Amino acid sequence: MAGVRRISLSEALDLGPSWRHACHALLYAPDPGRLFGRIPLRYAVLMQMRFDGRLGFPGGFVDPQDGSLEAGLNRELLEELGEGAAAFSLDRGDYRSSHATASPPPRIVAHFYVKQLTMDQVLALEAGAPRAKDHGLEILQIDCLVQL
């Protein structure tokens, strides 16, 4: 993409206050099931139908009062996925990459995290998401996609 470049986490954290940080997470679980009783499934991946009709990963903008990227991401997960997100937290060890947009406004750094959960945790998130604070506002539904 034009105007987007990969940067290190330390570079991202050194950017000034004119930059906004957004964090998103791929939440997945090994899936021992079989599709139609025959085709082995490998993983279930939690995605959401966003307000604009696109599929995406849960997360959002980090607020200055969050204190860290991970605190902001965990807050966003709780808002979007509901109380089931309180059963786990993402930390710096789950971080994978950062990408910055070069053209203002706004100047945004997108951070991506990956976390393996249990299948029970993924199913609990999927079931509880309609009761989440932001369900219906920022997101339309939660989907557990399999065979990835």
Regions of interest found by a model, annotated:
Residues M1-L148:
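N-terminal leader/linker segments that precede catalytic domains of diphosphate-processing enzymes
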